[in-house]
């Protein structure tokens, strides 16, 4: 009786009361629980819905403008409860911030305009770019989805509650907020915008990024890093020729990136093993 399929949706007390209403008494409620406990059936007795696991995003870039990552973070305003929303889109191969904007609130329309502007300025052609984001309201909004569909941009989203599915954007925001000049609060949205202008200009054109061979994101994004690396190699060769005893081996400048990914695909792991 306790295991009858027709009773699977009923709590024990409900079943006991219904049977009693039908003139049938088998045992007390506590005895019913004891019987079920003995066979490990005290927990949920109903058939449970099964949800397929969300597919892990796997994106690979071997040059600039193949995969972009974007996200939104909040910057504190002058007063408690006042925040400004910072939208940032970056290229995962070069780490170059292709676009950003700051607004008093989050908006799918604003996100759409920013993405469209970046696609135009970077001259991205149809079916060549994947755009990765988490599952925030703006990221999954109808205006953004429709724009990407119309322009032939592949949409990619992080799995729910998996923060490391968007590592490049997370790292960029951490770098921003751990910058020594980053204030606890901004006096106004104009102050916040000025700070971001200076920060992203520095990040793109001056900061030598360890993940891209100590080159600036702009030099990797726009293809001047190869020439810069050759110049570095010539300088190191000259130093070696002048005094080779200073070195245990011939010095080489750091290598340029050849590939970047979000969740390294299995075939890439196998090839690099």
Predicted regions and their residues:
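Acidic/histidine-rich, metal-coordinating catalytic segments
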Residues: 125-141, 159-163, 213-218
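Generic alpha-helical secondary structure signal
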Residues: 143, 150, 167-171, 175
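C-terminal domain-tail junction helix/linker
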Residues: 149-153, 175-273
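RNase H-like polynucleotidyl transferase catalytic core
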Residues: 130-135, 149-168, 182-189
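A short acidic/small-residue loop/turn micro-motif
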Residues: 91-92, 102-107
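Mobile-element integrase/transposase regions
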Residues: 4, 25, 37-90, 109-117, ...
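Hydrophobic "anchor" residues
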Residues: 96-97
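Basic, flexible linker segments flanking DNA-binding modules
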Residues: 1-67, 162, 220-232
